[in-house]
């Protein structure tokens, strides 16, 4: 981290760089989940810092716009110390993926030749034993991957086992391969290439607003959600710029996570299109045709103001109310 901060903030003194690193290192004063959420916000949005005799400013911990400025490392058997009954002990996660000295993803592996070892055991290692023994590592580690060499699944460090999913395509349009051992290569190329990894890390990890941290909801997109949100954004931009009115249609099966796909898309439109004057600060309207979808959508979106960055979220129940609501704002929300 010190190398990255010095390179991207040459005006800061060594003491000021150390203050920033100390703030990040000593982040854990709340619950484990609240600390994880706070640190993730710092990683994505930067950390506020006030240099001597200067105004407060945001200091980036990761450079998303220019990925080559970051320092990427994959470390095998990284030793993490903890204290148990007054004795210093260690844990060694199989692989940690570091960006600028921060362990953003933990990978736990099991031997496919061992008939008693499963990827569920890998999940237990992270979700039970590591959270029990080395939470101070996982505070900085939103993503988790588990694999036995045949089955490989992506999730988050707080996700239930059933919310870990395979990543079956490197790029949209690729055929889905179900061959043994292909899941490992598809995960590596589809998630862990540096540019793709930062894209997923920045905009496709979902936390509810801080007021709901007690619910401990953290998810990462599945591969259909990632590619759908990407394509929908591109289609909407093209439609708005060309004034064609052809935004596109997305078909999703029941249970595929369409509501989260819409949340990922809304975040993209709100935060990643600011340089497109035709879009600017958009007002996004989500129309549903079933009561259960309205309840599902309003429950998610009203708890996602920070994630969406769209201001107040309103549930509107009639066309007249919608007309009145839109009449009170120019854009944004």
Model-predicted regions and their roles:
Residues 1-283, 288, 292-308, 329-332:
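ATP-dependent helicase/translocase motor core
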Residues 247, 312-321:
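Long, charged, glycine-rich C-terminal linkers/tails
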Residues 319-333:
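Conserved motor-coupling elements within RecA-like helicase/translocase cores
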